[in-house]
Amino acid sequence: MYKKISLMVKKHGLLNSFIYKVNVILSKLSNNNVRLMNYYFFAQPITDQCVIRNASKRRIKIYMPESDDLIFAQCPRPKAVIEERFKQKSKCFVATKDDQFVGFIWFSEEKYIEDEVRCEIVPRPVGVTAWDYDIYVNPKNRLGMAFPMLWDRVNQYLSQKGYKWTMSRISPINSASLSTHKKLGAIYSGQALFLCLWQVQIMGSSLPPYVHISTIKQPKIHLLAPLSPSSKC
């Protein structure tokens, strides 16, 4: 046990490891009514340059489904969650292989209301910055071309509409996602920590409004994109 914790601290840092372990314990003891959620926010530059060449010749197909598409019956998200996302005007691209679900990526060109905590995400500037979330690929397909093909398609779509950036949130413990986003030129944009105690939610963030406490209302976090895509690290 000590060795496992030591490796986690070495990989993610003492604070992030502590927050993660506390969340696991609190969630388990409270039947998920008490949670401590830690998020990093990143900005990724939009580019019309494809990662995958000759994508049309591959067996994996990428398309944008309507809300009533039967493919959603195969995806690992409840029907109510999918319906709420379309209600919020979110869009997604789905990857399929031989008509079977492989993965998807969701994004919003406007505000987005989080489904893990009470929070409204507002990417800015309008028409320049989008919000992407819930990138999922079936475990057996994660070493294949599904993710880069999905990412290419989102980039093409947003680039054609004039977008320069897409923002996203990532758990500091999700090393794979952090590594992937850094390879895409992601820039760290802030952090937020949510303590959920049944109906009470306490937020502390490096971004305005910095501190928010409520039982019903949700904080609104404005995520401002970097000045220029050329500034990416």
Task: Specify the residue positions occupied by each region the protein language model found.
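Catalytic micro-motifs at enzyme active sites that drive phosphoryl/nucleotidyl and oxygen chemistry
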Residues: 80-84, 118-119
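Conserved acyl-donor/pantetheine-binding loop and adjacent beta-alpha core of acyl/acetyltransferases
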Residues: 88, 96, 100, 104-130, ...
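Conserved acetyl-CoA-binding loop-helix of GNAT-fold acetyltransferases
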Residues: 131-160, 179, 183
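Conserved GNAT acetyl-CoA-binding A-motif
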Residues: 158-170
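Conserved active-site alpha-helix within GNAT-family acetyltransferase domains
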Residues: 172-190
